[in-house]
Amino acid sequence: MYTYMEYLQKCFYKSTNWNEDNIFSNITASSSAILDFPIPTGFKLDSSNKSTEYSASSFTLSNYHSINGSLAYLYSSVPLRNTMGTKEISLQDALVGFRIIEPSSNNHKQLSSSKRHDRSSLLYGRMYFPGSALEAMIIKRISAHTQLLIKCINNPHMDKNGTMIVYLQKNAPKYSREFIYSTNESLIGFRCLYNLGNSDNSLNTALIPKFDNSVISIGTELWYAARTMSPGLSTAFRYSTRSTSTGKPLTMTLAVNPILGHLSSTYTVKTSVASTFSSRYDFNFFSYASNLSLGFELYNYSRENPVHSFANRSVNLSSEENRFLSHQDRKVRGQHGGNTIPIRSHTSIAQKDHSNMIINPIQNLDNYYHINPTLLPEKKKLLDEVELAAHLSSENSESVTTAFQNLVNESDFASVVKFSTSLNDRMVKILWEGRVKDFLVSTGVKVGMNPVTNAPEFNRFGVSFSYAC
């Protein structure tokens, strides 16, 4: 679950059209949210208030080992009008979960409209007590695609009483780059992420299929600690797409660290509107050690607003949501009825005489090869019908994916249960998060096997209450 300050930071990014999914550090965010979720420790109470559209404050109190707490303030030069308190906020926005990766062509329009936020900034500070530990963060937008991020920590128990990390980030639709410097070990780093694929919509959709819902990203990071002369290197690959028949998204990642010999692959899929499954396989090709991690999250619908999202929608599969998604093609075709050319089946098109057609290595929908069919007058009508069929197929695919995403966004969930296990670590984590009255509550437990007695034991247990208005 996001803290209120983290939630406001995400609202700031959304208001200024900053795409977090295009940053290398978030390339495995979906699988990490399902497999590596944290368990609360002890008792924690978080009370927050947004006094104006530009400022907010937060007070946190916990009893882990001893009574301690913190006081935080946040200021944004951009009005955060799209924020809500814990009573009204949807769980999809308040909880860390599966991320639907948007194609770069879709993000291009959003980023191009952020010029009015070129000089926006966000200031954040937190003071911990008892003690004198401080933390601060500054986000300064330099241009529509570039920002400066500074994080500072002051703690008397740290070397030189603290540390500072500076990020210079450039986030463009097709790529992102980061230059990083940390005073700890004089660490210098560079990260980059590139999105592959052609976002040009001017291509002939009748001859070349569209994959607007698929995103392929390749990134790498380089590190060098000048004080200890230690290098670091890792690279990662991410493939995110959506099913053209149901609109359900999935994400696959592959990360490699050649210096440490570590390889990690993940597969995360949203199996339904209310459920997500994720798996991860880790392998070290130096020690041949391996580990398999499995996890899932399952949302529970609110009793006040049960699954009514499908009641007024014309949707015979395994669930109501699938019945809706399976009838998108019928709905789209109904919108074109009467005003378009009658569409014949692909079988009837294939029965046409193709003896006069010119062969070319571009295959059309009727399994024949064509080259510039407009030059063939007797095939002009056939071409129009094929193009119309391709247009309807593409529109149907877009409507299905959009419909599924709308169902996820509009569903009223009351709680979520997360489960994660690791075979090699021999542990189980269970987390429940939901709304109780006006509070957001998070409670969970981590159970592992004692390596000496080989008996199960509770490693961590806690409950957290969060209130914001």
From Swiss-Prot:
InterPro entries: Mdm10. Keywords: Membrane, Mitochondrion, Mitochondrion outer membrane, Transmembrane, Transmembrane beta strand. It is found in: Mitochondrion outer membrane. It is a multi-pass membrane protein. Its main location: mitochondrion. GO terms for cellular component: ERMES complex; SAM complex. It comes from the Eukaryota. The keyword Transmembrane applies. One of its GO terms (biological process) is phospholipid transport. Component of the ERMES/MDM complex, which serves as a molecular tether to connect the endoplasmic reticulum and mitochondria. Components of this complex are involved in the control of mitochondrial shape and protein biogenesis and may function in phospholipid exchange. MDM10 is involved in the late assembly steps of the general translocase of the mitochondrial outer membrane (TOM complex). Functions in the TOM40-specific route of the assembly of outer membrane beta-barrel proteins, including the association of TOM40 with the receptor TOM22 and small TOM proteins. Lacks alpha-helical transmembrane segments, suggesting that it resides in the membrane via beta-sheet conformations similar to those predicted for other outer membrane proteins and porin. Belongs to the MDM10 family. Component of the ER-mitochondria encounter structure (ERMES) or MDM complex, composed of MMM1, MDM10, MDM12 and MDM34. Associates with the mitochondrial outer membrane sorting assembly machinery SAM(core) complex. HAMAP family: Mdm10. This is Mitochondrial distribution and morphology protein 10. The lineage of its organism: Eukaryota, Fungi, Dikarya, Ascomycota, Saccharomycotina.
